[in-house]
Structures are given as structure tokens and as C-alpha cells.
């Protein structure tokens, strides 16, 4: 009799183990300004003690996921968005109070599109069309500031961030998606959000990388394959595989025409989808607060269903302690190395003199 009771108790204990050891992965779709929706979703998840063990994203989803993985809290993300700096990132304008001493831009031009004549071309004088409509200087600097310390702390391994992270970019040379899990975090995110026509692509090794949304706007399959979470939470801010409408602006239309269909259907039984077709244009950040609030509201509505699937709960002290421990490993951002490319010797020396760099530096 005692043996039967002991076997029954052991069986109950073993049955309870998977529930207490469940791992949760959160995947975030692309969508430009719509992607601010994910910040509200993360707020609700933390507020309700939902464990977040892995994060993944595409385009704007990759930015939000990477910020979370690098130790930024949802409240800090909301504050950054509300400060207005995100509008500066996507405008391409440099803040004169921060960077103008070292970065010089041309004056404002009322023209929508500027083209220059290449008089040194072997083929003779010809027009050279721009590769992008918005300068990437501002967002390149912003992403470096956001992610360089975390890259150093993780030694370039995204599994060693505060939360393991991956994102997806599109390799246009080999015509397919690329899952990014190592390297420079700012470079990976910048690759994932290089919207065609808007920002210039990133060149990494032999790959020419554009926005990950072209091939996979909702990378739940890479997250599931690489991290194997028990529960997947999907945050989707777009309508899905729909053709552009007459109301869409020209950049939205061009991007949607380039996109391949994405699988937005998560596996049944171990997933919860939080979704809204946020009705703003890709670069419209004027409604940021409302977009973030929408994500929070939708996540709260889905919370009863999600909590049924999650055995473990984590309080605010857990998240605060984990962030503090990771930030303690992050070194301060210091620019102590540089490379000048595409310049003649006299031009390189002029730049060094201008920024007062030691001539002995290569």
C-alpha cells in the first residue's frame, strides 16, 4: 500500500515539473511605427509576472526585442519613444546639440528627390540616383548608443544578452531570410529594419541585407527552432498578407509589394496571439502613445488565456534584479577606434586634423 502511495506521489511531482519549468518565447512582427504596439504588450506581460525567456523580431519588432534583450525595461522604452527621439531617427536629421561638431549635413532642400551627375564615371557624365530617401546617419548613431554596451557585455553572442535574442534580415544577393544571432547587435537590428527605398541596405560579409519583413515579417519559426520554448507569445501589429490600399502612402505601397507572404499562424495548444491591425502609416510616429496603449490593452485582454498556459510567475523584483546584473557587465560607450574609407590621403589627414586625431593612428 505504501509503495502504491509513494508511486502516486512521485507521479504527481513529475507531472508538475514541466509546468514549473516552462520557457516562454515572445516574437514581434515588423510594421514600422505600428511596432510600438509591442512595448505595450511587454508592459502587460511583465506586470502580470509572465516569464520572458527568449525574444525575436523583425524590423521594428527587432528594435523592441533587442532593447528588451539588452536590459531596457518597457517603461524605459516608452519614455524613449515619448521623448521624440524616434522621430529624429526616422527623419534622418542629426541633433545639432549632440553630433554637429563631428557630422556635417547639407542644408534643407525643398525637393522630394535629389540626383547628382557623376562627371568622373568612365562611361561619361551620367545621373546617379540615390539609394535611399532618408539618411541613415541618425539611426546608425542611435542604435550604436543603445546597443554597443550590450554587445560588449555579451561578447557578440546574442544568447548571452539579458534575454537570448534573434532577428531576421533579408539577403538580397541570395534571395532569402537570414537569422542573426551573433555579431554587432546594432548592426543586426539595423539590417533587420533597412526598409527598401527608405534606408540604405547593410553589407555584412557577402550579404546585402534589407528589412527582414521582405521574407519573414513574423519570425516565430526561427524562434521555435533555435530556442524551443514551451509557450510562444506572438505580438502582431499588422493586418498580415494583404495588398496595399489606395490610402497607403508610396513607401508603404512599395514595401508591401516587395514582401513575400508570411506565416502568422502559431502552433495550437502552446501559443497565444496578441494582434491588432494598427491603422497608421509605416513612418507615422505621431500616435506613438495610442499605439503603445493599444498593445497593453490587447495583451491584458489575452492575459487569462496566457496565464493558463504559464506555470511560473515572476515578480517585478526578479526583472529589476536581472536588469541590474546585466547592466553591471555593460561597459560605457567610448569611441576609441575608427576607420576612414573611400578617401584620398590628403582628405584623410584633413579629417584627422578636423577632429584632432593623432596622425600616428592608422
What are these regions (language model features)?
Residues 7-16:
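Bacterial N-terminal signal peptides
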Residues 20-58, 66-362:
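Patatin-like phospholipase
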Residues 1-5:
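Positively charged n-region of N-terminal signal peptides that target proteins for export
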